[in-house]
Amino acid sequence: MTANERAFLVVAPNYWHTKLERRMNFLFYTVFVCLFSLNRGDPLNNSPNGYQRTYDNIQREIANYSEIAKKIINLAVYGSAQNRSYERLALFVDIIGPRMSGSRNLELAIQYMHKALMKDGLENVHLEPVKIPHWERGEESAMIVQPLNHSIAVLGLGGSIGTPPEGITAEVLVVTSFDELHQKAQEAQGKIVVYNQHYVSYGETVLYRVRGAVEAAKVGAKASLIKSITPLSINSPHTGIQAYETDVPKIPTACISVEDAELMARMSSRGTKIVVTLKMGAKTYPDADSFNIVAEIIGSKYPEQVVLVSGHLDSWDVGQGAMDDGGGAFISWEALSLIKDLGLRPKRTLRLVLWTAEEQGGVGAEQYYKLHKENISNFDIVMESDEGTFMPTGLAFTGSNSARSIIKEVMKLLKPINVTKVYENGEGTDINYWIHDGVPGHSFMCIFMCVYVRKKTCIVI
């Protein structure tokens, strides 16, 4: 969990009672989608056996799963599986630690999970090879050297080039938007551009992190520093991916804390000249060998049909990756574990995929899609959990209107734990390839991410 997530939870203590509920949404939904086909948005009256199904039939079928729902909640909340996913995750992150793309730790994490899934008794557990980026940040620092000496909290962005060993020392130009940068293009030449953009939502504001270096390079800047993409801060910079363009010069780029960005903005507004020295030892190495991890519970009636649940195993290098995305990966595993422990056998194959190199732009997911897209008609729904796991509120869903109606019926079964909402836009980095080709998809939603990431689509507090 990031410092910003902790800060949010401090002001929302009344929600801690949902601790035992944090994974139930994903688990229930996984069971139910195995029992009937969403089938890429096909009409409701299509079924594998060719008989006519009405919406009323499907409503009644879903309602009949209430006893299964009770069994799952009893096992997960009160039974032997109580807190199991949390304990599994805690052990994993304590032993393995950060899991950066291309790192030895990620390799160890994949080996660990491969063995754990086999030991858990899941079926068809195997590894699928992937080539992934290998970038290391090295030593890095930033310092205001004029008008005072002040150390800047800084984290280089993934894939950034480094600076010369002596660093880059240059005057700063502070801007609040790309438009302002372009208006001041003449002033930006030879300077370090500092973005002090206004925070709207993560989805909108993250463009400054992704494109900040490119836009600054276009106007001749030497480097770019971006205010971390968050409305909350305890002088804690965030890292993340950024994207260069082939026809634009590459310049070093990093995120700085909200406090340091606003400090320089105040200085600049007074007309004070600001000079910064930036040092980054970042290096990019040849692509490394890695793997997506796959495990299944094979379907009893339509084994060729796939319901995919997923989370990514890699993380950034400056934390344990417990929430991004250890939590998502482990509740996805827990979904299969609960079904197996209860002796349930879904009609369709329930497939778990733990992605590699998501933080580098969904590399593992893209290669998985390319490998399996010829069988796309067999994928009934794709799911990922990468937006937090505590305090669930519902699902963000993308699919046909008829499929959405079915999802809403399923979610009614979660009323006892108050997880019933169905939001728009279920896209996620690792499932977008399938969704764009017409496969229904959803992402798990929780209170924090609704407020922090999706302000325009989630109103929950």
Q: Where are the language model's segments positioned?
A:
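Cleavable N-terminal signal peptides of Sec/SRP-targeted secreted and luminal proteins
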Residues: 25-40
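Soluble metallo-hydrolase cores and metallopeptidase-like ectodomains found primarily
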Residues: 64, 68, 147, 151-185, ...
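Metal-dependent peptidase/peptidase-like ectodomains
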Residues: 253, 261-262, 302, 317, ...
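Stable alpha-helical elements in mature extracytoplasmic
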Residues: 64-69, 81-89, 96, 105-113, ...
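Catalytic-core environment of secreted peptidases
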Residues: 82-106, 114-124, 183-187, 191-207, ...
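His/Asp/Glu-rich mid-to-C-terminal helical/loop segments that flank catalytic regions of hydrolases
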Residues: 337, 348, 449-461
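Noncatalytic luminal/extracellular "stalk/propeptide" segments of secretory-pathway proteins
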Residues: 44-70, 74, 78, 90, ...
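Extracellular/luminal Protease-associated
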Residues: 100-103, 153-252, 320, 417-420
